[in-house]
Amino acid sequence: KDGYYRVRTPEGYIAWVSESSITPKSATQLEAWQISSKVIVTADFGHAYTQPDEQSLRISDLVMGDILTMLDASNDFVHVSYPDGRIGYINSKLVLPFDKWLGTRRLTAENVIKTAETMMGLPYLWGGTSVKGVDCSGFTKTAFYMNGLVIPRDASQQVLAGQPIDILSGGTLDIKKAIQNLQPGDLLFFASGTDRPPTARVTHVALYLGNGEFIHAAGSVQINSLLPEASNYGALDTRTLIAARRYIGQDDSALQPLAEHPYYNTGKK
């Protein structure tokens, strides 16, 4: 409609996307793509080129998590195709075979936190889910995605998934209880303004690191603390914290392993 497609993303998000950003595929074409050999970009950032030579013309930029069809490979470059038919070459150091990469994903707090910390300092960008910039929920989504789990897109949706963790007493944040009950890898959820009730609309999310610290995209990706005595105490964030959820180890239809997701499943046994 008027130059836009109404689409549903892999996590179920419904939105409008410009026609120039989408290449429609038939069911047969999608199936062919699913069973094709693919690579995933594991480096933060890179480029594809018209020739197996980084001095040749660029086809496009690439960011961590991009998936492309692999045509063939040499020691130094991978020959790839794009959904819109473009052909390019990527330095092999930037990618891994998708099936191999997927087989090595281990959804642990340590791994999710490690991925999150590689994004330290990235600028905040509303709607962002890459090293070009991230918003708060795009940041947490990327940290889990690169470890094999598709989670809801927005903070207000992410707070509805996983196991609730008790961090409140009498409807307000209990720091002692929170520190006792939270585990690294849990998600913290915040409402706009101070002293909001637990039923307030969630507008921000962070990843808990342990020992009172959390990492989040707020201006830039940074680490703050729930503890008033800490040098990186996040006073405003702490006053607006209203909920916490645990994704790791939870069976929830809103949390979809990449290996089982119909959009990513290769169909190979």
Set out the residue ranges of the language-model regions.
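Second-shell loop/turn segments in exported
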Residues: 99-103, 123-131, 195
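Boundary regions of SH3-family modules and the immediately adjacent low-complexity/disordered segments
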Residues: 1, 8-40, 44, 53, ...
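Extended non-catalytic domains of envelope/secretory-pathway proteins
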Residues: 46-48
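Aromatic- and glycine-rich peptidoglycan recognition patches
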Residues: 29, 54-56, 199-269
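Active-site nucleophilic cysteine motif
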Residues: 116, 128-147
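Sec/Tat-exported extracytoplasmic proteins
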Residues: 52, 119-124, 143, 147-151, ...
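Generic structural signal for buried aliphatic residues
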Residues: 62, 68, 185-188
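...with weaker cross-activation on analogous glycine-rich loops/strands in unrelated enzymes
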Residues: 152-223, 229, 260
